[in-house]
Amino acid sequence: MKIRNILGLSAVAVALGVGLTACGSKNNSQSSNDAKTQTLNLAASTRLDTIDISKAGGYGSTGNVYESFYRLGEKGSITPGLATKGYSSKDGKTWTFKLRDAKFSDGSPITANDFVYSWRRTVTPSTKAQYAYLFNAVKNGDAIRSGKMNPDKLGIEAVDKHTVKIHLTKPVAYFKTLMAYPLFGPQSEAAVKKYGDKYGTNSKYMVYSGPFKMINWNGTGDKWAYVKNNQYWDKKVVKLNRINYSLVSNPATSLNLYNQGSIDITPLATDQLKNYQNDPNLKDYSYSMISYLRYNFNDKDAQKKAIINNDNIRRAISLSINRSVLSQKVLYLKSDPITGFVPKGLARDPETGKDFADQQGVKDTLDYNPKLAKQLWNKGLKELGVKNISLNLLTSNENANSTVATQYLKEQLESNLSGLTLNLTSVPSKIASQREQSGDFDISLDTWGGDFNDPITFLQIPQRGTSYNYGKYNSKKYNDLVNQAENVDANDASKRWQDLVNASKELNLTQGVSPLFQDDTYYLKQPKVEGVIHNTAGTQWNYKYTYIK
């Protein structure tokens, strides 16, 4: 999941899908009323840009209004969704799903054809779906996405009204988990045609398949709400009647509203967290999210391109950063020291149960070693035939955390690497993202959050040809290892795992990206709120079983 606000609380809140209600203090009678009406009040740090599942840039909370074959339960478990069962062929290349009797929020039946239509719509190039690459393993998905084949050739078919069959080009180890992602859910062709260009631009121009449906969102507004979807197949277990959201971009304002009782959950900025360490309502609702330095290997400036493509220069930059100080003293994070591009807690070895993050580390890559850094730096300067280097670090200006982190990086790098000038370029997150996509940067401070609980959700990002590989990192060894994992060894869990471990080690050795820290996010939650399901990847917030006591 690409986090638009490059580092910072706003980015985290967007990823986590937190949302909110109107300002003002609540008394006990109002809190009691929330219990009677089963109303949850949340804060959103940024406006929604779309509710079209084909075009969305993330699905942190939209799993509450959309549903696929499965949905994520506690600790990333796969729980029933629109399918009553799903099974694969012996070679892992064919999946069959049996659908339950279910309806969209407008009362129309959800059928196998709605899945077929949805998938075809998403991979159609003109849709410009950000996550279309996740369909590459579906037969003809890559060819369709690149405009070489018609969408009706996609490897998905409606065998009958309640049976969907999917044909893959290779086994996908995490396919079942992927099928819990709203991206792969059904869309009503009738609704898309009815609303035309308006589809997904307003809450009333959409039909919903999840526990809730959205109301009062006009595409740009500061307030919207989820209300119980009375057409939902499992509506009997849904206790909340309404979830109110309001835009509150300032962390201090959000915290004040929480303390007044106006909102029920609020994220804490780093400068706020230190004052709530012992609060009984403090909750660790972290996301599998890595903040890292992205290098532009295809820099438009020829001299800078040569600098960035020098292995010694990149390793020197990485070894000059004291990550422990940055995460624990500067940003007040509690997460373990980072070991590579895959965060801790995302995935475990299928044989030993060991965390992937404990296996990917490589000495003298992410350590703080200023002595070795200087040696490599001087070697790189000599190879380049220069004595001084000036590079620009691109970041977002939409949160104070970004400013703090980049100032620390500038101080560390310039003090440890003689001849380096690091210029900070701080712009709105939307502009930063546009500049990355157009290749208009030297180095950027970026963030990625896991879409599902498998290392590939991170390791596919620096792979050649991936749409999010804005820096154009291209290592033959790295690409070969990832391809080996996803093709030759795709049906052998142990071999695939080792391929990915080796790929992550190669990424460390080459510093194709320089991981900085794993974000951890703490929230305050009102004790009256129960049943919130939180996951570290994918659809992070599940309010299906939430209630106000």
Predicted segments with their positions:
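N-terminal lobe/hinge region of extracytoplasmic solute-binding protein
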Residues: 43-90, 127
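A structural "hinge/loop" feature
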Residues: 44-60, 82-84, 175-185, 304-307, ...
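Surface-exposed binding/hinge segments that line
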Residues: 132-190
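Gly/Pro-rich hinge or "lid" segments in bacterial periplasmic/extracellular proteins
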Residues: 172-237, 242
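Ligand/substrate-recognition segments at binding pockets and active sites
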Residues: 219-221, 370-450, 521
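Ligand-site clamp/hinge motif
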Residues: 230-276
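Structural transition elements
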Residues: 335-379, 400-402
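Extracytoplasmic/peripheral linker and loop segments enriched in polar/acidic and small residues
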Residues: 419-432, 459-526, 549
